[in-house]
């Protein structure tokens, strides 16, 4: 009986994935860049892009939100042997963003797609006119065969006004783009009852339909391993996206062909909103 229920749940989630008209795929720093060297993981990125191309081939649209600029540019500051100051992180982001986009562009080009870089700030996503302009830009890029690849403009953002992590940026992009599904690729399989690194008996939560105080406590027990975000920020992102009527998946992204893995039933946590359109859908 339990196996039958599991198969039914998997089939339902697969349908949601295959039927999503527009998807946002967020890629964490720990997934796209080597944690020690900051080098872009080119072979892995190629498998992700092959997944993205396959989605486009069956009539779906994909918008990418990527972290990794600071990681890719930080090797210029290795001699400091300490945590980077704000201005150093901004410089690292400016250097690394170019490397990051070149890697994406080269991989997309091999499959006949262009790339459209979009750098957003908190002011952009908080302003209705900017949101509408961004939505129009996303659509025009998709119309001409260019995949929007989005990052926060870390080179100019300050702690007072920055979004702070790309999980919430991805959720706001999902609002703006009227996406049906937000996929958060991370260094963990999903939401656990406790931190699985500390407690091997921790259980993964396969599905969340309402973010309760208990769910928030679970998220607080799952700290980030790398990057600026953790499970708490992913839960924040899930709440934002669910309020816009968008399904959310948290899954481990470090494996090759990470989107195909989700499609084939790899461990993940799905956040499923009520089956209705909400007033906030579209970020208006």
Curated annotation (Swiss-Prot):
Pfam families: AA_kinase. Substrate binds at residues 67, 154, 166. Its EC number is 2.7.2.11. SUPFAM superfamilies: Carbamate kinase-like. Pathway: Amino-acid biosynthesis; L-proline biosynthesis; L-glutamate 5-semialdehyde from L-glutamate: step 1/2. Keywords: Amino-acid biosynthesis, ATP-binding, Cytoplasm, Kinase, Nucleotide-binding, Proline biosynthesis, Transferase. It catalyses: L-glutamate + ATP = L-glutamyl 5-phosphate + ADP. GO terms for molecular function: ATP binding; glutamate 5-kinase activity. It is found in: Cytoplasm. Its main location: cytoplasm. GO terms for biological process: L-proline biosynthetic process. One of its GO terms (cellular component) is cytosol. ATP binds at residues 26, 186-187, 228-234. Catalyzes the transfer of a phosphate group to glutamate to form L-glutamate 5-phosphate. Belongs to the glutamate 5-kinase family. This is Glutamate 5-kinase 2.
């Amino acid at each position: 009986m339990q196996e039958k229920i599991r198969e039914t749940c998997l089939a339902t989630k697969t349908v949601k994935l295959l039927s999503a008209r527009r998807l946002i795929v967020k890629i964490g720093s720990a997934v796209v860049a080597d944690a020690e060297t900051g080098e872009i993981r080119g072979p892995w990125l190629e498998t992700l892009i092959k997944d993205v191309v396959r989605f486009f081939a069956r009539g779906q649209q994909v918008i990418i939100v990527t972290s990794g600029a600071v990681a890719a540019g930080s090797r210029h500051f290795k001699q400091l042997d300490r945590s980077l100051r704000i201005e150093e992180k901004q410089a690292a982001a400016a250097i690394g963003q170019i490397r990051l986009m070149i890697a994406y562009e080269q991989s997309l080009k091999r499959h006949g797609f262009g790339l459209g870089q979009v750098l957003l700030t908190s002011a952009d996503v908080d302003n209705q006119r900017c949101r509408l302009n961004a939505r129009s830009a996303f659509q025009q890029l998709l119309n001409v065969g260019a995949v929007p690849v989005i990052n926060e403009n870390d080179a100019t953002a300050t702690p007072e006004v920055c979004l702070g992590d790309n999980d919430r940026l991805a959720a706001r992009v999902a609002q703006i783009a009227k996406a049906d599904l937000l996929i958060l690729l991370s260094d963990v399989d999903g939401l656990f009852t406790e931190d699985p690194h500390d407690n091997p008996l921790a259980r993964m939560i396969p599905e969340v339909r309402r973010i309760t105080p208990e769910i928030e406590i679970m998220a607080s027990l799952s700290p980030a391993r790398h990057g600026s975000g953790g499970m708490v920020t992913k839960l924040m992102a899930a709440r934002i996206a669910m309020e816009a009527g968008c399904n959310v998946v948290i899954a481990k992204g470090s494996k090759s062909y990470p989107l195909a893995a989700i499609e084939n039933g790899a461990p993940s946590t799905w956040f499923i909103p009520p089956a209705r359109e909400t007033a906030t859908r579209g970020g208006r």
